[in-house]
């Protein structure tokens, strides 16, 4: 059994985080940090929506110093919410911010100098680099101790240091070790006001790395709180479902003390989604809620089970979506066309796990998961609120699909129309990589570093490429963080400056500093040159 993780308590200003305290909700402004009044105004809107911590980008010295003016303005208006500085590449900015705000977020992959290596680092060279990290981190820790400032050590899947990449590769193990190295330094320096996070736009990687982080922390006697989020989740329904599947899977396992839902657009739209996700956990958090399940489920099993085929379910068939239409149990495709009818008598040849995530896992724990009967995951939903339906079903089904469990999903709702239920189901399969039926778009929520209208640009990129099933295309606001956080993408559209864009193929730059008004045409030409373009079918 995966043991229950109980985090310690840290304080973000006056706000306690961890232990049995409620799961805290946070977001990040997307205003220019140099625009003091706009940042203050947006922070207030976030707080009024239910945000408990506000993060602000501080990419340079000027922005870090501006945090003092923003904090002063908020306090004068009676807003006492803790502020978090988001730092990349600039330790000096972090040190300035640590004397002003309640928490500083650093990325171990780019906080210290990224010395390029030729591979196969010797143990001596590896240890020497660690010593340099200690030297670089010491001033920040001293300032944080003197000011009661917390630190989030936030690893990103796509921005691991070359030293970590040499030894561990681009893996969850590398992500975890990158964070734990910094955590051990904090402990050795007598600093414990620490929060960890593992971020990826790939829900499976995010879940796997966070589970591994918790296991490693427990093995080393650490109990730091954990921040959860699917980075660059995208926009609209897809972003909501992707975030809920990743965050909810871990909350179901008792992991997670604060969350941020990253949606492209105004950050205020993130808060209702975050509230919908945390609602059922905050009512149970004061109890010893722990998910029921077998060791097989809890160990993070992700390979798809081998099963026989029954009426188009299981075997070599893709994970199916079952919908009740006109009194019949139908298998439908992503266009809501019926591709098969499931006779009632065939249900006896299937294993049906019914209920919410807790009930389904409890039932599955009694099954022989090495039996070759296909498993249908089924649950009924009484809500007529689309957001609540999307969040609940993404958690219930997603938390099992991520672990390779489920040959079909069968959401039942009498208050949400059947076509919307089917669309939500396919979005859950896409989010968990259980079945790919369309283009996947990875996009950042934008921040003060973004110099173009990312919502408009994302819609333009979608319009041009949404027919390219199976491709992953990223739209990122800035060159500072974009390339690292779109590691899972096949192609990337990244803001490079005012009016200019850099295009990526995988992790490599394909075209630099393209005028923004030409970028989509150049992206299409890049797709054609790479053999990934096809014309959209006529409707």
Question: What are the residue ranges of the model-derived segments?
Answer:
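Glycine-rich phosphate-binding active-site loops on the catalytic face of alpha/beta enzymes
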Residues: 52-53, 101-118, 253-268, 399, ...
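Glycine-rich, proline-tolerant flexible connector loops at the mouths of alpha/beta enzymes
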Residues: 30, 49-74, 108-128, 194-203, ...
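Conserved, mostly hydrophobic/aromatic
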Residues: 25, 86, 153, 196, ...
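Active-site mouth loops of central-metabolism enzymes
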Residues: 20-38, 82-90, 163-176, 231-241, ...
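N-terminal amphipathic alpha-helix/helix-capping segment at the start of soluble metabolic enzymes
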Residues: 1-27, 141, 145-147, 283-327, ...
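Glycine-rich tight-turn/loop motif centered on a GG-T
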Residues: 102-136, 163-173, 510-512
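Alpha-helix-loop-beta-strand connector modules within alpha/beta enzyme cores
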Residues: 63-85, 132-148, 213-222, 461
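Catalytic alpha/beta core domains of metabolic enzymes, predominantly
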Residues: 124-133, 165-308, 345-468, 472-475
């Amino acid at each position: 059994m995966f043991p229950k993780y109980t985090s310690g308590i840290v304080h973000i200003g006056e706000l306690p985080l961890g232990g049995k305290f409620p799961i805290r909700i946070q977001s990040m402004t997307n205003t220019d940090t140099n625009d003091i009044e706009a940042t203050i105004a947006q922070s207030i809107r976030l707080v009024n929506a239910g945000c408990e911590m506000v993060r602000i980008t501080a990419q340079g010295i000027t922005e870090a110093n501006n945090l003092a003016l923003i904090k002063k303005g908020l306090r004068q208006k009676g807003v006492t919410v803790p502020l978090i500085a988001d730092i990349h590449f600039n330790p000096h900015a972090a040190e300035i911010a640590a004397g002003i705000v309640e928490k500083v977020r650093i990325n171990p992959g780019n906080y210290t100098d990224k010395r390029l290596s030729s591979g196969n680092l010797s143990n001596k060279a590896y240890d020497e680099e660690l010593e340099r990290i200690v030297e670089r981190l010491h001033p920040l820790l001293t300032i944080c101790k003197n000011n009661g400032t917390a630190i989030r050590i936030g690893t990103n899947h796509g921005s691991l240091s070359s030293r970590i990449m040499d030894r561990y590769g681009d893996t969850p193990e590398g992500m975890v070790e990158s964070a734990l190295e910094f955590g051990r330094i904090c402990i050795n320096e007598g600093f414990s006001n620490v929060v960890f996070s593992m971020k990826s736009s790939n829900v499976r990687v995010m879940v796997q790395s966070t589970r591994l982080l918790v296991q490693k922390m427990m093995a080393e006697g650490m109990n730091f709180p954990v921040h959860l989020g699917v980075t660059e989740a995208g926009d609209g329904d897809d972003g909501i479902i992707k975030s809920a599947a990743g965050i909810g899977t871990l909350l179901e396992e008792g992991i997670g003390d604060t969350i941020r839902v990253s949606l492209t657009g105004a950050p205020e739209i993130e808060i209702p989604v975050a509230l919908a996700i945390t609602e059922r956990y905050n009512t149970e958090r004061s109890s010893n809620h722990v998910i029921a399940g077998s060791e097989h489920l809890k160990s993070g099993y992700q390979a798809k089970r081998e099963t026989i085929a029954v009426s188009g379910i299981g075997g070599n068939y893709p994970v199916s979506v079952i919908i009740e239409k006109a009194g019949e149990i139908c298998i439908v495709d992503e266009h809501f066309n019926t591709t098969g009818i499931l006779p009632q008598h065939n249900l006896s040849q299937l294993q049906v796990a019914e209920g919410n995530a807790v009930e389904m896992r409890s039932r599955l724990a009694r099954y022989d998961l090495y039996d070759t009967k296909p498993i249908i995951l089924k649950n009924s939903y009484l809500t007529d609120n689309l957001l609540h339906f999307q969040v609940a079903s993404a958690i219930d089904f997603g938390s099992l699909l991520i672990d390779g469990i489920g040959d079909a999903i069968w959401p039942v709702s009498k208050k949400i129309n059947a076509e919307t239920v089917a669309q939500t189901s396919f979005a859950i399969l896409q989010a968990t990589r259980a079945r790919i039926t369309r283009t996947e778009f990875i996009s950042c929520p934008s921040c003060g570093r973004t110099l173009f209208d990312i919502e408009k640009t994302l819609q333009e990129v979608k319009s041009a490429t949404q027919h390219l099933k199976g491709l992953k295309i990223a739209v990122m606001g800035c060159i500072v963080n974009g390339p690292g956080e779109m590691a899972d993408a096949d192609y990337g559209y990244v803001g490079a400056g005012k009016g200019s864009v850099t295009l990526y193929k995988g992790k490599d730059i394909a075209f630099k500093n393209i005028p923004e008004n030409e970028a989509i045409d150049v992206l299409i030409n890049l797709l054609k040159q790479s053999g990934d373009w096809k014309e959209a079918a006529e409707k």
